């Protein structure tokens, strides 16, 4: 996953993580779980790698942005509604947030009235971070393995037995 890759390439940086469900395998000398307040206040880069739940919707909002370091960079390739786009656009335009790299927005395809389209230092890609050759190959390999198991009479990942 993207988070695994980030942790393995950390090149001496200190990695802080926040999650209501901690994965203790990730907690190492280079990765430490902290409360959200500490993550917001200490991070130079905040990369969102989380699902969209009621407790994560709008987690990047005016209130939480005010707790961030000046000049922080925001990355999101998870779910668009994790970010209150108007609040992020205002923070980008004011310089509070230095830059944002987004692969997702709250409504896709992006609408022309999305405030992030005119915000300073905001790069938006069309929900394609999953599309590198390696990711597509992995999807094909999983599909082939699932089909083989099904044909052998030992299907995996059964949802409705």
Task: State what each model feature region is.
Residues 1-14:
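Conserved anion/nucleotide-ligand pocket segment
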């Amino acid at each position: 996953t993207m988070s695994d890759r980030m942790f393995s390439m950390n090149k001496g940086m200190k990695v802080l993580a926040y999650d209501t469900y901690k994965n203790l395998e990730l907690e190492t000398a280079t990765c430490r779980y902290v409360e959200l307040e500490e993550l917001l206040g200490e991070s130079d880069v905040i990369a969102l790698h989380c699902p969209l739940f009621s407790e994560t919707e709008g987690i990047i909002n005016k209130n939480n942005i005010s707790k961030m370091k000046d000049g922080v960079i925001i990355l999101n390739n998870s779910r668009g509604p994790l970010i209150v786009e108007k609040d992020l656009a205002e923070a980008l335009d004011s310089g509070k947030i230095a830059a944002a790299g987004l692969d997702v927005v709250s409504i896709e395809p992006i609408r022309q009235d999305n405030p992030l389209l005119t915000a300073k230092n905001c790069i938006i890609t069309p929900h394609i971070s999953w599309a590198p050759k390696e990711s597509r190959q992995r999807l094909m390999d999983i599909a082939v393995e699932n089909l083989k198991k099904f044909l052998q009479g030992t299907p995996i990942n059964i949802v409705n037995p």
